């Protein structure tokens, strides 16, 4: 079902290229900061290629947004020092819990399906081809309000949150292990993110 996640590859590539330029200019200001020209490897991946991971089982009454996701671009995947990108598919009715990223900007590309998105003080429905820009420190939540799976591509302006995602998951093929709310908080700290708690999940 991950084939839907590449329906707007051209848009994703253009956005990623713009973010690379911005991120690189900031990196140049930091002494000793690694350069993507020195470390990043060119990469071409099909829809189902990448680091497929299965989310761990929550020990409370909550459930993750999706059972699996694919990390495609990150320092560990191809040496990228400026961008992180991946894909996931949300089932009908599934939600993205309210959270924010303390360091990274994020872009969400809706490749298929229909989402209702809460972003800061804004709220609206978005459809296939829609885009959400999430500045750092902005609260975001969403829900698949359609009758079909919703495919997403996520792009971060700097590495970090992929470590939260890895902490909350296991490699595909391994048995998912339980994860407590306290462990989820520890995982969030790894990627410089913060959750508002499941009680704040949106209703639609």
Regions found by a protein language model. Name each.
Residues 103-105, 110-115:
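Glycine- and acidic-residue-biased ligand/ion/polar-headgroup-sensing regions
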Residues 10-20:
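Bacterial N-terminal signal peptides
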Residues 80, 116, 136-162:
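Ligand-binding loop in jelly-roll beta-barrel domains
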Residues 25-82, 167-204:
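A short, N-terminal "cap"/entry segment at the start of jelly-roll beta-barrel domains
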Residues 71, 86-101:
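Conserved short histidine dyad/triad with adjacent acidic residue
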Residues 122-136:
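Short acidic-glycine-tyrosine-enriched beta hairpin
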Residues 1-11:
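Bacterial N-terminal signal peptides that target proteins for export
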């Amino acid at each position: 079902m991950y084939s839907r996640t590449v329906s707007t590859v051209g848009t994703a590539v253009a956005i990623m290229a713009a973010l690379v330029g911005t991120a690189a200019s900031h990196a140049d200001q930091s002494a000793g900061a690694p350069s993507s020209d020195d470390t990043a490897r060119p990469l071409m991946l099909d829809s189902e290629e990448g680091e497929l991971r299965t989310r761990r089982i929550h020990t409370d009454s909550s459930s993750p947004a999706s059972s699996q996701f694919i990390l495609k671009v990150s320092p560990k995947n191809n040496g990228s020092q400026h961008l992180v990108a991946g894909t996931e598919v949300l089932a009908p009715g599934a939600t993205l819990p309210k959270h924010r990223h303390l360091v990274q900007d994020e872009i969400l590309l809706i490749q298929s399906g229909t989402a209702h998105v809460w972003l800061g003080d804004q709220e609206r429905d978005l459809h296939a081809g829609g885009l959400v820009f999430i500045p750092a420190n902005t609260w975001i939540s969403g829900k698949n309000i359609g009758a079909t799976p919703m495919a997403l591509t996520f792009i971060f302006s700097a590495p970090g949150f992929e470590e939260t995602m890895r902490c909350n998951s296991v490699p595909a093929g391994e048995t998912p292990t339980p994860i407590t709310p306290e462990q989820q908080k520890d995982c969030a700290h790894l990627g410089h993110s913060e959750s508002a708690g499941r009680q704040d999940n949106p209703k639609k």
